[in-house]
């Protein structure tokens, strides 16, 4: 497509800090695809409802890129960082047999169970993306200046389900996909610089 900066390999190279070659390629291809679709949208002079699928696709691509990079860096590069350990733990009640087997306590008609309140591991897919971005900001590989826009792009992707769109009367706009694009290069530069300076 005319005026698309760089070929596919250029886009892949923007993720040079990702050591996994398959993930790096797929991230680059997603970036290239988002840019390609934007240029295609421009070339076809679409507007109104005809523009909607182009914008929706771009938001989905950029949100997926942000998510994949943040998750990969948190759990592959910084899995031993104190912030990541905190992110993956929560307090939970764990039942224990503190009383003799024949002893039973009740509150009205309900049986009372003894428990301890201790740290428990939170499954990665149960951690909200907003919390992952905040953790990345505290570690330093995501700039606080762009964190809210990254979270918003991800929220828009999740709100792109037709039923949710209808219930909340939401429309994705071209400006939202442009913001997702404009934030990506500084996001990648911040990650690259931080990893280089910290030997990660």
Task: Identify the residue ranges that each predicted region occupies.
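Charged alpha-helical initiation segments
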Residues: 1-56
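Short, hydrophobic, well-ordered secondary-structure elements
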Residues: 52-78
